[in-house]
């Protein structure tokens, strides 16, 4: 339903953590058939599964990186077209590490909790930032705090 309703490209998570093996390949194939622009796999996804996906689908495979111990060359050889860096406070450092070794590979990264961390990640070489905006409850909390102090909403 999301793929049908979206007016922007959708990258679909297909597993690699709890969902493993041939099921990940099947989900990737199904996502491609439904119109996904790319598929995303989690850190534990084996190289064998990534290479099977590469032989099965034509859309980009986004491989998640969460620590310095990742063999980037191996992941690229397996079929990674894009890296998704989600390494918490080490994200910008890992983005810079990847960018230094592979200047042309696209990198998507989590930006972190602040404008400063997002800018550090961009400066490190990320091509795109994923961001989770505050929920309506978080936004409304600020409004209610102002109301309780007798202040107008700003």
Please tell me what each predicted stretch does:
Residues 3-4, 32, 50-58, 76, ...:
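Surface-exposed amphipathic alpha-helices with a cationic face
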Residues 35-45, 81-94, 124-145:
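Glycine-rich phosphate-binding active-site loops on the catalytic face of alpha/beta enzymes
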Residues 5-15, 54-64, 99-110:
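Short beta-strand/loop segments at the ligand-binding rim of alpha/beta enzyme cores
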Residues 4-33:
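A glycine-rich, hydrophobic loop/mini-helix early in the fold
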Residues 22-30, 70-78, 113-131:
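Catalytic cores of alpha/beta
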Residues 1, 13-20, 36-45, 60-67, ...:
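Catalytic beta/alpha-barrel core
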């Amino acid at each position: 339903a999301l793929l049908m309703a979206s007016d922007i490209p959708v990258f679909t998570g297909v597993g690699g953590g709890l969902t493993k093996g041939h099921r990940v390949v099947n989900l990737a194939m199904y996502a491609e058939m439904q119109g996904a622009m790319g598929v995303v796999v989690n850190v534990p996804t084996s190289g064998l599964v990534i290479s099977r996906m590469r032989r099965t689908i034509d859309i980009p495979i986004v491989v998640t990186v969460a620590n310095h111990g990742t063999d980037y060359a191996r992941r690229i050889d397996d079929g990674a077209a894009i890296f998704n860096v989600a390494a918490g406070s080490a994200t910008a450092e890992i983005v810079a590490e990847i960018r230094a070794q592979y200047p042309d590979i696209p990198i998507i990264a989590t930006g972190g909790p602040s404008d400063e961390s997002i800018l550090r990640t961009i400066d490190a070489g990320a091509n795109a930032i994923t961001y989770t905006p505050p929920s309506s409850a978080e936004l409304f909390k600020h409004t209610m705090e102002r109301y309780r102090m007798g202040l107008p909403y700003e």
